[in-house]
Amino acid sequence: GLSVLVQSQGRNLIYDGGGRGASSFTVSYLQQQGVTDIQYLISSHYDEDHVAGLVGCLNAFHVEQVIGADYVQDTKIYESFMKGVEAQGLSVQHPAVGTEFSFGSGKFTILAPSSISGDDNGNSVVIKLENGSNSFIFTGDASAESEAAMCGSGLDLECDVLSVSHHGSATATSWEFLQAAVPELAVVSCGADNSYGHPHRDTMDRLESMGIQIYRTDKQGTVTAVSDGTTIKWNQAPCNDYSPGDESDQGTQPEVTDAPDQTVMVWISATGSKYHNKPDCGNMNPDKAVQMSEADAQAGGYEPCKKCF
């Protein structure tokens, strides 16, 4: 599951609450942090492992605003969540992408979803939290399709810290999204020895290849970060353990393709993992782009950019 508590100037925001097994822990942890009122309670989506703990919070604390995805789920836990919202005299808000909310010394912006589909994970509410020059993105279980929509939204996706989508599943954390967000650190929230094999090898390989340091709750437990608007201090060092949850996970094997034309020239960025047909694609810095043949780029492990190829 996933649960994030944000505190600033006496105000509290909770993003997801974890599953049933963690609900009492979530409520107890918030009480230990002095929480009595929650200004923003955000449910990324309504899967049990994200929303169950929020039901406990609705029963234990006074809540001022509830934000969630604009769809209905036919489950008992969703019904319990909605009853808890109604008992507070509230309704679930569905703010549009780009909507900003002030919070303590900072603010947060809605990045997704831009539309609602039949994919519950893809409907996840994604937010970017900013405090001074520090920024964090919380993704819920956002899908690769949702990430692509965010990349095309024109919103600023760069962040210092990324909460990795869907517990490190290979269904998200795409190259395109990582290259737009360029986080220095990532947090993977997943249960130890979970039955899904989270995090998946493909995702961890992408994080490692971009030099993104990682925290993992399955290895390190609760992770806390304190931002003063300039620097971020953590309660522990990153574990930088990029191994998959299931050691038998071999990841996606590359497809065999025809040999590339040696005369085709492409561009690569200083830190990216894709090659481009122009030096200023996306967030690339053309002054730092390097030109080489397509054959050499592929031999170096680079993949074609989906935007310009």
Can you describe what each PLM-predicted range is?
Residues 1-258, 282, 306:
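Non-globular, low-confidence helical/coil segments that flank catalytic cores
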Residues 237, 243-309:
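Mature, structured domains enriched in cysteine- and short glycine motifs
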